[in-house]
Amino acid sequence: MQSRLLLLGAPGGLGDVASRRVRLLLRQVLRGRPGGDQQRLEVRLLHSGATDSGETVSIGDVSYKLKTPKNPELVPQNYISDSPAQSIVQHLRWLMQKDLLGQDVFLIGPPGPLRRSVAMQYLELTKREVEYIALSRDTTETDLKQRREIRAGTAFYIDQCAVRAATEGRTLVLEGLEKAERNVLPVLNNLLENREMQLEDGRFLMSAERYDKLLQDHTKEELDAWKIVRVSENFRVIALGLPVPRYSGNPLDPPLRSRFQARDIYFLPFQDQLKLLYSVGANVSAEKISQLLSFATTLCSQESSTLGLPDFPLDSLPEAVQILDSFPMMSIEHALQWVYPYTLLLGHEGKMAVEGVLKRFELQGSGHSLLPKEIVRVERMTDSHGSYAHVTIRVAGKEVTIKVPAGTRAVNQPCAPDHFIQTVSHKQLLAEMVQSHMVKDICLIGGKGCGKTVIAKNFAALLGYSIEPIMLYQDMTARDLLQQRYTLPNGDTAWRSSPLVSAAREGKLVLLDGIHRVNAGTLAVLQRLIHDRELSLYDGSRLLREDRYLSLKEKLQLTDEQLQNRSIFPIHPSFRIIALAEPPIVGSTTQQWLGPEFLTMFFFHHMKPLVKSEEIQVIKETVPNVPQEALEKLLSVTHKLRETQDPTAQSLAASLSTRQLLRISRRLSKYPSENLHDAITKACLSRFLPSLAQSALEKNLADAAIETNTEDSLEPELENYKCEVVAGSLKIGAVSVPVHNAHEKMKVPDVLFYDNVQHMVVMEDMLKDFVLGEHLLLVGNQGVGKNKIVDRFLHLLNRPREYIQLHRDTTVQSLTLQPTVKGGLIVYEDSPLVKAVKLGHILVVDEADKAPTNVTCILKTLVENGEMILADGRRIVADAANVDGRENLVAIHPDFRMLALANRPGFPFLGNDFFGTLGDIFSCHAIDNPKPHSELSMLKQYGPDVPEPVLQKLVAAFGELRNLADQGIINYPYSTREVVNIVKHLQKFPTEGLSSVVRNVFDFDSYNNDMREILMNTLHKYGIPIGAKPTNVQLAKEFPLPEKTFMGYWIVGQTGNGMQKVLCPAETNHVDIKGPVLVNMEKYPIEKHEARFLSFTEECTSWKFPLDEVNLICDIAVSHENGEQTLYVAACNPVSLYFMNMTGKNGFFVDFFDIFPRMASGSWRPFVTVAPLGSPLRGQVVLHEEQSNAVLLLDTTGSAIRRLVLPTEEFTSKKSSWWSKEEGETYRMCKEFSHKNWVVFYKQTGNSLTVLDVLEGLAHTISLPINLRTVFLVAEDKWLLVENETNQKYLLTKPAHIGSEDTGACQLYMLKEELPSTGFGVTQETEFCIPDKVSSDQLSSENLTSAVGQKIASPNRILSDENSHATIVVGFPDLMSPSEVYSWKRSSSLRQPSVTSMTMYTGKRTNATPRHNNCVTLTHTNQVVRILPPGEVPLKDLYPKDVTPPQTAGYIEVTDLQAKKLRYIPVPSAESLSPYTAWISAISDTDALLAEWDKSSVVTVDMGGRVRLWETGLERLQQSLMEWRNMIGQDSDKHVQITIERDSNEDVSDPKHGKEDPDNMPHVGGNTWAGGTGGRDTAGLGGKGGPYRLDAGHPVYQVSEVEKDAVPEDVKRAAREMAQKAFQQRLKEIQMSEYDAATYERFSSAVQRQVHALRIILDNLQAKGKERQWLRHQATGELDDAKIIDGLAGEKSIYKRRGDLEPQLGSPQQKPKRLRLVVDVSGSMYRFNGVDRRLERSMEAVCMVMEAFENYEEKFKYDIAGHSGDGYNIKLVPVNQIPKNNKQRLEILKTMHEHSQFCMSGDHTLEGTEHAIKDITTEEADEYFVIILSDANLSRYGINPARFAQILTSDPQVNAFAIFIGSLGDQAARLQRTLPAGRSFIAMDTKKIPQILQQIFTSTMLSSI
């Protein structure tokens, strides 16, 4: 008997400290040679001669007799080391005891290969055969018991591992019990307990004892007939599992747990481990090794797990030491990073903790000099065992050569591969990867698009590996990873190895791309492959590590073939795995894929993003001719975004990955004119970013001096953007490309498409990318024409397309192949995707965002590397060179492209974030609704017959709605599709009104009141009368005009009255021009509101311009030029001018403050009149200040102002300054002919006229013999003058050109007003009255005829004065004969000085008459229009007795001489009035001024700055009313009848009237009575063949629309009472008074809309979180494609169904988000509340937060604090006392109010912010938000904004935002520039505060759910 001593272990000796020290010293000397220690366990193997089973193994005192295995190839090989550690021997001894007892064991312990290795060592020691199964979440009962396979058309049951082990007496090793889904493992319960099991095929497994008992009574044949099978007495189960709950997984089922005996297999004890490491790392100093181990052990301790640090993978330490052994000079800290990448794994605290431990064990700070620099060279060497390479690496100045596995192809030298640019960091990374490659598989971690795949490929090329890329996706099953079933041509089922398995056998390098996506339970099946290089497959074959395979081969003396027949294969020694992953999201609960189990499998290398210099190098070498300047700017922005901590910036940086930058550079180099701003915003898809991110991006771009293209704002003409196909090449815009010659014509789309500029621009952009070979992604709202654009694009390119539409249930299989069963065989049909790849078609992926992102991920490898594995084993590869001669390969056709279409990310679209996951592999294009111009031209083509104004209204209204949607005020983004549908309807049914047709779109919103209100307002603003009834016509009441009176004659220049004509001399001077001075013209947007939205009135449009509260309007004028009207409004306090073109969207404002300073004393009141000039001086205006006689010429196009000095000024008295002349001297300007570019000035009471000819620059002064009162220019050459004091009228005729030699001087005639003879009834003593207005042109002869009532054609003028409504002078001024005067007298004269007005005005007479008499003559419509104050209007007749007349700014009196009617139209009163009431009354006696607008309408401007247009002409009104009624639709109230036309078989006899029924009863049908409905031959309605229709007047029993809509009054009342009662009841419950309720309602209602919007979004989030998932392996549901074959074979659980996925057990609880609102309740809030309501707005904001988050406490926990002079943390709402009802909420608002009223002054904004940010993180939460409201005037309190910015960003975990209230001038804007982008808001208008809050919530909180 020979006995062999197998192993010696070191004890875990417990000697005293001293002896331990001595022992350690000795060990240092002897270096791991075990010294004289105490006794230890030995394993003895005793041979007892030749008998087979006589061998015994004893461990210590336990011994076990070996049996010869039946299948020796199933016994584990080479697991036992020569000297196992003592602790392992202890484990083995325990296992042997349990084995002898016949008990099943459970080895429990931390993740890692140790437990498996202990089990395998024991089985190898006892020569037991093993059945191994790695459980995963995909394991089902069939994997354990029996599986069906089809052989020759029959289904057989094949025993699986558990059954095989039981019958053959093997040991079943179950690994990963915590991975199996609940209730799968109980299948084994009975087998474990009683060794019994019922099988599917009818057999029954019975325990050995019972079977043997039965054998005593029955024969074996009988038992076989009963299908009873004996379970071997040697059958044992060893289960391996992790302790749950410490690790994630399903906890053990109690009945299952009770059937196992457990043993904790913890990491090796310190000493054993140390010894192991010493033996591995002989070159590394012992001290370093023990420090390394101490560090690792510390991180595995119980304390560190409470910190939330994942366990350190101790099992990887030997490999790390092995590397250090080859590179003793390398930094240990760095090697630790590979084993335990704590910088990626842990948050800030975790990192600090780990670094603390590193310091403690002196492992830190070994510097960068000790890192590997680069690979110097690679040499190939092949020996019998496979291929290796010698790689030389330079580390710390030395070169070290190591031997690493290599692939089968030729190796590359480090600098050889083309198109791989080596940067310093990449060289270093490659060197490090080779070091890891020496000992273990690698996992590369890096953000998307940073070049992981490129590095991995380069690494493979370096070592001569073939690559096997495997794209992983989320719902991948274990079968997809290892083996899949398929059918053989004869119908048998078989297993096909996955690429991973074949790669393992062939020694390839496997790229597991996207390992972070796969479920950890699925990856578990790879653990054994990675740790031990062993694998058991579903079909029973096993893969062994090569050395084990060889030793087995040697022992059994078998050939490779024989072993393969026994299904045993070697794994190639060169086989390696590189996993590619994105970094785990620190602190997130869901995406923490890098767990303790995963850490044991790989060495981790972090691929950091490129630094700027390297990125520039990469881009420059890849795209050599990229413009330098653009590149610099691009990278500076990108790196600035990457470096910030701000999550918003981070998400933007993610869209600017290296891959995107390369794409942008490629475009820039090909199209150098490309605008960088566009390129970046396109890459980030900024059009659809939340508003915060958008502003952050804009700010960063502005900082980097990247500007938008200024021309972009203007729309290019369609001429420049034509698409045309010329000579076989397509040209869109500036880009051209040859047209494709398609074979499959029918697949080329052809679509109705109307060209418009914007879509052309988009298509040009797409073409640019298409030419560069990019795949495109079009993102946009619904209905903006994404599909149309793509189809049109492909049509132009003549490319065939394949179309695939994704949806919720799209799976990876359905994207690639569709399996179907035909005749018992599985046949795969190519999906459009595969067809497109093969044939080179264009694949259009529609609704790309609807499929789960884990599915669409597989498109990534296809687009990026052109590789993809199909379900039937074929694979798609990029270059055809690899295809030749290898079957199952499909080469990508060079023409293949993918065009993906997706909706914009984010609410309200419910899609998944396709752009976020895959955006950077496509070139993205944001598709927007067409701009108004493009949209209009497109709609014209859809509705050629729809009137253009209607289309314009639609375009404008929808444009505004889209803006609202972009601002987040409404959720639904209205698109072109909706407008097109409306237009199509109007085109087909022109009589239907617009307002009823738009309801086709807007009825969706009719139940949402907020939304409805916004819609109504917008549509009404653009004059779409939705909700109006055609009967709502509210025109002014008409009164009869008094009869006309003949007033006598005006006689001019007749001799004999002693007054001969007088010649008036004129002198001509040049005008002195001073200037020009540039003036600042401010532009402001104008919102026009159509006035006729609910009822039809004379008013048609109104808008407001931004008038100061104290400013007054003193004159208005309108210029008409080529059909365009421009309105000029002059204001006088301060002097300023507003003007706007009526078709435009913008107004302009010019301030003349520096020319006319406002006087401190206020005694001087400037008064400015304005006269617009005509062409060629169009756009120029003369302004005249009446008291200083200053004449200014403003050029509005060149924004310059000149002063014109008139000659008269020279002899005016030179006073101290020209604006302080004595009172009462006023100069006037006559501007009737200013459009001819001349105006006349005169001084009241003066005796000269000055004619200013602006075009010539001349001034003609005419001296007169009389003192003037007023002047009317009744014609260009005839002027009516009125003398001062006497009011005598004169007519001045002037030659055409003053100053030319040949003409005479001006002539002055006296004008005599002669009364008719007294018989006419006109009294003699008529005082001369001064006309208010004399028209400067005449009535047409038709108008004159109808006015005077006799046919007459003659020159005439119409005038108006205070005594008459209108007066016509026939024959004046051209005929020298006496002119007849006809007048329509007023019942009482206007402006009778009443008592009140006398007291009101004091001072001189000039003040008593207002400056403007507001009278306009519309000669075209025969009307005189003026505005009267309410006192001059017959209000009693206008309004019924009991109605109080409304407040008005005055009434427009329309005297219509055509219809002989008077109408009074009320002008609504001004929204705000200047406090200078006396000044207003000096300007006008009404609060509005009037001017002629065009031939039949007038414009009024009130003192509050609101402009209104009024149509007064009857014809125009008639026409507008028609249009308005058409908009509403005439037939909405008509009685509609349904008629079905069918031929009745009865013939038609002669038509007749039929009998009249004496009783006139209603009749239907028949052939007898007249007046029936639906009969034949007789007259009636809807009949057949009758002579005519006859309605006998029967009532049609139909409630009219109006009545239908009206609910009876009593019902309404009951409803009201009920609501009131409920309200009272509710108040009583919460003890709130009605007064309080009203107060609260005031705050609540102000923010109702925001609350509503937020709650909708929060609801959606709740819903999104609860989306159901596919549950697989169900017994009912839909057939799962992946299990079709199992279905053929007759299995049951082959279905899948949607269900709520239970969270994985052990996965962390979802924590709520924390929000803290810190509001300002300082004294200044109370003090300035009166100015801008800031305190109230803050209270509204608080109210909004409280209301919006009510009932979402489990998702959002909020609290509200205040800061003021009293302190920085005033608790308003503590986190656990959320107010429940309105009363409690009101209490909080009251507290805020009172606090700010009574607190100390001072400011604690900074302290409040700092405290909130520090304090909020004390409690665990998913995300933290702090929002500060402050009105801090930072500079006043001496706070440095930079310090504030620093506090805001002090904790990267906390998203802090600041909202500043207040009007700090430009300080606010300066502040915003210093604060971080997107983090600070300035609320100049306090109304915005709730909106800003809503923005913050929607764009940040919601992004991450």
Swiss-Prot record:
- The chain's transit peptide is found over 1-45
Gly residues compositional bias, start-end: 1568-1583
> Quick one: where's region Interaction with PEX7?
1-260
Which superkingdom is the protein from?
A: Eukaryota
Q: Copy out the induction comment.
A: Up-regulated by high fat diet (at protein level).
Function comment: Exhibits ATPase activity in vitro.
The protein depicted here goes by the name: von Willebrand factor A domain-containing protein 8
- Record the organism: Mus musculus
Lineage of the native species? Answer: Eukaryota, Metazoa, Chordata, Craniata, Vertebrata
